[in-house]
Amino acid sequence: MQVSDLFIREMPSDCLPRERLLAIGEKALSNQELLAILLRTGSKEADVMTVAATLLKQFKQLSYLQQATLNELMAIKGIGQVKAIELRAAIELGCRIYQSSQIKFGKVTSSQQVAQRLLQEMKGLQQEHLICIYLNTKNDIIQQKTIFKGSLNQSIAHPREIFREAVKYSSARILLAHNHPSGNPTPSPQDIQFTKRMEECGEMMGIQLLDHIILGDSGYISLREENFFASE
């Protein structure tokens, strides 16, 4: 018996997803196999494929896994701090790659177009995220940034932070969007007040606020389309 034959037969199952990726490519692998590759090894209680399956069962959807905290990941048997950090880093990198591919050379043609993209991008977020999209005079996207995470009710969002970036990018226009974790996109009095304040600041600086979009679970509300802008 050849030593190499013995090694192949006794190769741990942990290695199989990597071998399959080499043989057939990453697109043919299941979510469980891709997670197993990121995790690399299992534990004494469970092999890596079992740990990956437990992750998928625990969070049910990849969009829920995207929002998993370090502590939530570490609550899974077989995932320690190092593995949790590596998973969070991989997830964040994937989000940034997706976001970059969506905004590069893009053009804003309507609030609906922006809302449809952001609904997918911000799905499952447990906190309010305020997004600002910076545009040139032709409505080409220059940059997209998350201004803050929290709640507009807490008065965290300050026009200074938003317009400082607008000046930095030489933006002619901006478009704001934020999600309602409750799933209901109906604007609150604070949302309306914040929008009017941003519109006034934009007028003083010569930077137009095109719209403020509020995102729910499966729909959105455009404050401009709903006539909440003073310029309407």
Swiss-Prot record:
GO terms for biological process: proteolysis. Zn(2+) binds at residues 178, 180, 191. Keywords: Hydrolase, Metal-binding, Metalloprotease, Protease, Zinc. The keyword Protease applies. Transmembrane segments: none annotated. Pfam families: RadC, UPF0758_N. It comes from the Bacteria. One of its GO terms (molecular function) is metal ion binding. The keyword Metal-binding applies. Residues 107-229 form the MPN domain. InterPro entries: MPN, RadC_JAB, RuvA_2-like, UPF0758, UPF0758_CS, UPF0758_N. A motif (JAMM motif) lies at residues 178-191. Belongs to the UPF0758 family. This is UPF0758 protein EF_2926. It comes from Enterococcus faecalis (strain ATCC 700802 / V583).
